A protein has these predicted regions:
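Electrostatic interaction modules used in gene-expression and signaling proteins
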Residues: 1-123
Length: 123
C-alpha cells in the first residue's frame, strides 16, 4: 500500500493535480480527475500486459510512460476528447490509449495546428 500511495503522490505532482483542482476551469476539473484516476489505476495495478489501441504492451513500458505524463499531456488529451465528434464505445480504453500516445503525438499535433492556422486558411 505504501508504494501505491507514493505513486499516487508522484502522479499528482507530475500532472500538477492540486493546481488544476484549485485554479483550473471548473468544467475541466472532473475530466482531469478522471484522467488522474485512470493513470493511477494503470500504474498501481500490476498486470502482465496493458491493452493499448487493441495491442498488448508490456506493463512496465506502459507504467514508465504513464509516470512521465505531465499537465500538458492531460490538457492535450482533454482538448482532443472535447473535439471528438465520433461515438466512443469504450471510453476508458480510449482514455488509456490517448494518454499513452500523448507524449508521442502532442508536439506534432500542435505544429500541424500552427501550420494550418498560418498557411491553410485558418486565419
Amino acid at each position: 500500500m505504501e508504494d501505491v500511495n507514493a505513486y499516487m503522490e508522484i502522479i499528482k505532482e507530475n500532472i500538477e493535480y492540486e493546481h488544476h483542482m484549485k485554479y483550473g476551469r471548473w468544467q475541466d476539473k472532473g475530466l482531469y480527475e478522471e484522467l488522474y484516476e485512470v493513470i493511477c489505476e494503470i500504474v498501481c495495478v500490476k498486470h502482465k500486459t496493458v491493452k493499448i489501441g487493441g495491442n498488448d504492451y508490456p506493463y512496465e513500458l506502459v507504467k514508465s510512460k504513464f509516470l512521465k505524463l505531465n499537465s500538458s499531456h492531460l490538457e492535450y488529451v482533454i482538448g482532443c476528447m472535447q473535439e471528438t465528434t465520433t461515438k466512443i464505445a469504450n471510453i476508458k480504453a480510449y482514455m488509456v490509449t490517448a494518454l499513452y500516445n500523448a507524449p508521442s503525438t502532442m508536439n506534432h499535433y500542435y505544429q500541424q495546428e500552427v501550420q494550418h492556422d498560418m498557411y491553410g486558411g485558418g486565419i
